[in-house]
């Protein structure tokens, strides 16, 4: 194996100890047998000429002999660092000096020697590798990893450096990067796999999600596919992988799972999860793994007098963990106050003559959908459904507008999500989503309509290990073609039923929807930067600033009440900023608390939401 090669003047015993996660000094830090591993063709001092034509005073053979005799101080004295303008000693002598300094526990001086040598011999991969060993001993893992990547750029086939790099990433908790580093050298090899606790799921489904054969290499692709399948199939509340090193250099894979709380297994946790939306006059009854068949039923019931809602989804894997079939139901009865939304454009209604604009909307939609994974990078989702909407109690609203026609429709929804960039080394990923919704209405003049939307979703963890800091940016755009009913308009603002958040714009007014800008097309950018403040087994707290900016454009459809021009939209760009806290609870729920400030109007909004 590479790290047992006696001809390698690099930290020979470090990787053997790292593979069992018992960190030991590198050769640079421990001085392990370097004299025996010096290249046999080292140039004698008498034949090594410096740029000034002067020969070095110490020969490699004599310094090697001092090193074999463990005379560390004499080695250091025999190879002094040159003063400015003096010639640099040969590379082999600088390596011996750094090893001897490490044996004297002078790690800082050893690192200084290696840095000088790396500048003098920039194409010699041994120096960044040895310096990484010293920095590893000093627990500077991030810089050690950076140096090892530099060494691999100089010597791409250096299996030892690649093994070392994978180990450093593994010790930092960056399993993705460790697998990316190890896989080219056929590591890590799995001897065993355990799922703890053992789930009561169909065995065939488990075997397909967690494939295993003794002696196989655990690949990054396998890990990513499993993560994508678990995101598609809500089989567990949480899952984490643990690689346990074995004495023979192989690994055991432990898959730690947290099951969804059940009424029999965890009645208290299940009750808390069901009541998590109680502050919003709602409950979340959820039933997981029905009859141990991986079938789930997720429902949401809200009895708020201004916005009643019932949603339900019955889902199950089909044929393989890459496919999920689901039946959906969404029924709503909502009171809307459009007073400010309709008058956003002063050319329609003068602001000084505001009149209440109220309506009640009833809508029900039922459909069936199929979600399918292609590897770990592509997710295709499609569904067909039937919907019916009815508008009542219109006050101050142009009732003759097609927006408010009572109508039924059949619709097709389809989306494709693709991972464009996935860099475990830089801890950055970028995904794109394209979605289309097409509807055929049975009431004229609506006829047909199409809604298109696109998104770019970027995540970055700036630190080399952990998730203490996190940056998330989401860019979205949408457009509408054809005449649409009111419920198909986009909305920019904070509303727990809305995904297009502008957190400085409250979507409610006196509990009724309609306070946020509406329109037929939009652009939106959301950026969040948060910091992990606290984490324990029961709760984790993240806090940080955010910036939302966007524009929503009016529809071309005017009212039929004597006015001309669009009914909805915002005349200017909107920009909000603020602070947000996220509390992830042991019930697998996340509570969001925030303050948003509208930079244009100066208004403030306090908001909260909870998700599972």
Task: Spell out what each predicted region is.
Residues 58-85, 96-105:
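Alpha-helical segment of the N-proximal tetratricopeptide repeat
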Residues 558-612:
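C-terminal beta-signal and terminal closure region of outer-membrane beta-barrel proteins
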Residues 227, 232-431, 494-510, 515-525, ...:
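Gram-negative/organellar outer-membrane beta-barrel architecture
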Residues 22-40:
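Signal peptide processing junction and immediate N-terminal pro/mature segment
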Residues 102-103, 110, 115-121, 126, ...:
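Periplasmic polypeptide-binding modules associated with outer-membrane biogenesis and secretion
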Residues 10-22:
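Bacterial N-terminal signal peptides
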Residues 60-61, 91-96, 126-130, 160-164:
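Alpha-solenoid helical repeat scaffolds
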Residues 409-541, 545-549, 553-555, 560-563, ...:
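C-terminal outer-membrane beta-barrel translocator/porin domains of Gram-negative envelope proteins
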